[in-house]
């Protein structure tokens, strides 16, 4: 059975982190997910536009939702920040008066949003709609050699009344996926904290210290690498990792994977197809371990 969604990749996956888009497209077919990409979608606003003009932010997202609604599909996001912003906007657009007001703004484009669309992150879809049993069926190289730190960030968890999927204080969805791919999930205090990205342009020293503290805690608990469902978290943790390590006076060297890269590695998809060479913090040691295990299992099967 195929699950079909309107794919909203967001800006980061088509710009600064194309490996997120690449790895998403590499895994979804194996999970029975079919997508129609929203080619004319707007930026979600990332919480910035709503600060300047909440009505414009709602209109931008209603415009995107209307495209999915016209196709008869729910929206699939692959960015935790997009999920948080769009989930909040969609909840407000369920109110008929709000929706009518925003539709008047969209009228010159001939666009009307009826409020029927749901917005779902890939993480939620995999856990709840694909099912962990199907994930386990697709595993070719169990990641049993690794202790993996989940990092949720803010927007995919809070505010819970706009999102409503995972417990904002004690989420479990990433941990379930880590176990499904054969890894050991690392428990640490920073997994639900902010990555620092929202303030990185204004207060870089504070932002990198926040990121550094989260990674330091994960390393202290024995994490081999970290996985996140948000590309903005990924940028904060990967691109700024050297400065983050300096801020907390700890050499980190902690690889950061996108969620679909984690799934793809365990499915036996080659590293090149997952865009793993794009990371600033090298993931080569992880790839070598996975490839060695994959080759060993292939030799065993051929005996």
Where are the language model's segments positioned?
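Iron-sulfur cluster-binding electron-transfer modules in prokaryotic oxidoreductases
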Residues: 1-303
């Amino acid at each position: 059975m195929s699950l079909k969604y309107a794919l909203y990749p967001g800006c980061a996956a088509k710009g600064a982190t194309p490996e997120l888009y690449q790895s998403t497209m590499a895994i979804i077919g194996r999970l029975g997910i079919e997508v129609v990409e929203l080619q004319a979608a707007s930026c979600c606003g990332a919480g910035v536009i709503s600060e300047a003009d909440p009505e414009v932010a709602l209109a931008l997202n209603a415009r995107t939702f209307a495209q999915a609604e016209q196709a008869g599909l729910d929206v699939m996001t692959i960015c935790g920040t997009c999920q948080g912003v769009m989930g909040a906007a969609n909840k407000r657009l369920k109110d008929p008066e709000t929706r009518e007001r925003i539709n008047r703004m969209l009228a010159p484009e001939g666009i009307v949003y009826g409020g029927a669309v749901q917005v779902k992150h890939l993480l939620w879809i995999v856990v709840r709609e694909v099912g962990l049993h199907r994930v386990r069926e697709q595993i070719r190289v169990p990641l049993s050699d690794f202790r993996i730190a989940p990092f949720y960030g803010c927007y995919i968890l809070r505010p819970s009344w706009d999102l409503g999927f995972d417990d904002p204080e004690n989420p479990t969805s990433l941990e379930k996926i880590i176990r499904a791919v054969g890894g050991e999930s690392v428990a640490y205090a920073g997994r639900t904290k902010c990555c620092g990205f929202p303030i990185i342009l204004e207060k870089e020293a504070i932002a990198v210290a926040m990121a550094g503290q989260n990674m330091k805690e994960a390393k202290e608990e024995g994490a081999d690498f970290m996985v996140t469902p948000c590309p903005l978290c990924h940028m904060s943790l990967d691109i700024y990792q050297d400065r983050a390590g300096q801020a907390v006076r700890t050499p980190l060297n902690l690889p950061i994977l996108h969620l679909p890269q984690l799934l793809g590695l365990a499915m036996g998809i080659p590293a090149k197809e997952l865009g793993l060479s794009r990371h600033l913090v090298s993931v080569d040691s992880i790839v070598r371990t996975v490839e060695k295990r994959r080759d060993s299992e292939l030799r065993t099967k051929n005996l």
